Amino acid sequence: MGQCVTKCKNPSSTLGSKNGDRDPSSKSHSRRGASHREEQVPPCGKPAGDILVNGTKKAEAATEACQLPTSSGDAGRESKTNAEESSLQRLEELFRRYKDEREDAILEEGMERFCNDLCVDPTEFRVLLLAWKFQAATMCKFTRKEFFDGCKAISADSIDGICARFPSLLTEAKQEDKFKDLYRFTFQFGLDSEEGQRSLHREIAIALWKLVFTQNNPPVLDQWLNFLTENPSGIKGISRDTWNMFLNFTQVIGPDLSNYSEDEAWPSLFDTFVEWEMERRKREVEGRGALSSGPEGLCPEEQT
């Protein structure tokens, strides 16, 4: 996501010789037959005439030692910073592509274009997973912070990058603890925060239950949703407690509902549901019995 070019600069000061820094006022020993004069000491070493065993001049070796390159840690940090800046720039461009003209957020129209580019339907499970990762406060809206933080959370800064994360998000949502978090998020996601709602409208709750259980449909879900659909007058809304407890209900109560007890601390709506469902099943069994016996209690073969 970006490359860093590190420039290595030599230190401005020179190092002393092997025996330490010389006093500027001191003179070197005179050579044979020559007058006293100041010795010219090459930077970072002894005079150039000194040769190491491998043929390298000591002055050259010492000078090379003085070239202090930027450490790999510094280079790595700089490269990471550059990569983050490049990623932020791409996120900014992506966000501006869908944001509303007046509000600094992606609203309904922008969300439709966003989902269209992702090749997903706005009402499908993958969009719910994306909203979960973005920690969106309400449906059909991503604020700037939600969008940027969410994309960082899934390590994506492009349409292709987001699409590439969907398989791992689907797998993650199958984990029990992750699904519980997703499930509880979904209730809050369905509320109209601007109106200060504290419970879900029945129709919204039904739609969200179908959506959140896309990958793991509990046996009792269809009966529960039928109950909610056929009893509109008696159910005004779904509270947070009822929503949260329904997940526990699907995990501990068997499909035949035989281990359900009204004495346990279940929401009262569950008592009504179990009573309604057991009565419905009873009528269903009686209806099948009447059909099998035929008119006037005769078996079909006896009627011929």
From Swiss-Prot:
A GO molecular function held by the record: ubiquitin-like protein binding
Cell compartments where the protein resides: Cell membrane; Cytoplasm; Nucleus; Cytoplasm, Perinuclear region
GO biological process assignments: negative regulation of cell growth; negative regulation of G1/S transition of mitotic cell cycle; negative regulation of protein neddylation; positive regulation of apoptotic process; positive regulation of protein neddylation; protein neddylation; regulation of cell cycle process; regulation of protein neddylation
Coarse class of the protein's main subcellular location: membrane
Residue intervals of the DCUN1 domain: 86-278
UniProt region (Disordered), positions on chain: 1-87, 285-304
InterPro entries: DCN-prot, DCN1-like_PONY, PONY_dom
Disulfide bonds: none
Cellular component per GO, a single term: ubiquitin ligase complex
Lineage top rank: taxon: Eukaryota
Lipidation sites (N-myristoyl glycine): 2
Sorted UniProt keywords: Cell membrane, Cytoplasm, Lipoprotein, Membrane, Myristate, Nucleus
Reported function: Contributes to the neddylation of all cullins by transferring NEDD8 from N-terminally acetylated NEDD8-conjugating E2s enzyme to different cullin C-terminal domain-RBX complexes and may play a role in the cell cycle progression by regulating the SCF ubiquitin E3 ligase complex, after UV damage. At the cell membrane, can promote and as well inhibit cullins neddylation.
Assembly description: Part of a complex containing DCUN1D3, CUL3 and RBX1. Interacts (via the DCUN1 domain) with the unneddylated cullins: interacts with CUL1, CUL2, CUL3, CUL4A, CUL4B and CUL5; these interactions promote the cullin neddylation and the identity of the cullin dictates the affinity of the interaction. Interacts preferentially with CUL3; this interaction triggers the relocalization of CUL3 to the cell membrane where CUL3 is neddylated. Interacts (via DCUN1 domain) with RBX1.
Record note on domains: The DCUN1 domain, also known as PONY domain, mediates the interaction with different cullins. The DCUN1 domain mediates the interaction with the N-terminally acetylated NEDD8-conjugating E2s enzyme leading to the NEDD8 transfer from N-terminally acetylated NEDD8-conjugating E2s enzyme to different cullin C-terminal domain-RBX complexes; the neddylation efficiency correlates with the DCUN1D5-cullin and DCUN1D5-E2 interaction affinities. This domain is also involved in CAND1-, cullins- and RBX1-binding.
Protein's name according to its UniProt entry: DCN1-like protein 3
Lineage: Eukaryota, Metazoa, Chordata, Craniata, Vertebrata
